[in-house]
Amino acid sequence: MRVVIIGAAGHIGTYLIPMLVDNGYETIAITRKMSMPYEDAPAWHKVKRVLLDRENDSEFIEKLKAMEPDIIVDLVNFNIKETKKIVEGFGGTGLFHYLYCSSCWAHGMAETIPFNTDDLGKEPLDKYGKDKYASDINLK
């Protein structure tokens, strides 16, 4: 299976990508610039690295589709507009999963920790949290 990771060189991607490669996934790492992962695991040398900027490339979705991913892991989607572009752009394709990385900011303050997201009042903390929450709802 081919997995495309958007925002691959950040904290989560640094550790996720070697696990995917080590488990036999063909992995494509998308970053806006040639950023190095926090740790240079040997698995990173088996990864195809692609420079692509969703905010500044009007053909982002088409270029993403051309990679023919089975799974997309989106670690840097910050607004509902981008979520909808992915969902609409990949409708009817062979995409098996779209994994969207949300944020605790989408849920608001918790009275107890750890918290159950189903028990929260869903009062996002700011615009970032509101956008993440809107994407959460859109993807359900």
Task: Locate predicted features.
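Short, hydrophobic beta-strand segments that form beta-sheet elements in well-ordered domains
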Residues: 26-31, 72
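NAD(P)H-binding glycine-rich loop region in Rossmannoid oxidoreductase-like domains
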Residues: 39-93, 106-114
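N-terminal Rossmann-fold cofactor-binding loop
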Residues: 30-35, 53-54
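N-terminal Rossmann NAD(P)H-binding glycine-rich loop of SDR-like oxidoreductase domains
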Residues: 3-25
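SDR active-site strand-loop-helix element
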Residues: 6, 30, 75, 98-103
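Conserved Rossmann-fold NAD(P)-dependent oxidoreductase catalytic core, especially the SDR/UDP-sugar
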Residues: 84-133, 137-140
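Short, glycine/serine-rich, charged loops/turns that create anion-binding
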Residues: 10, 32-34, 105
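Residues at the starts of beta-strands that form the adenosine-phosphate
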Residues: 2, 26-28, 96-97
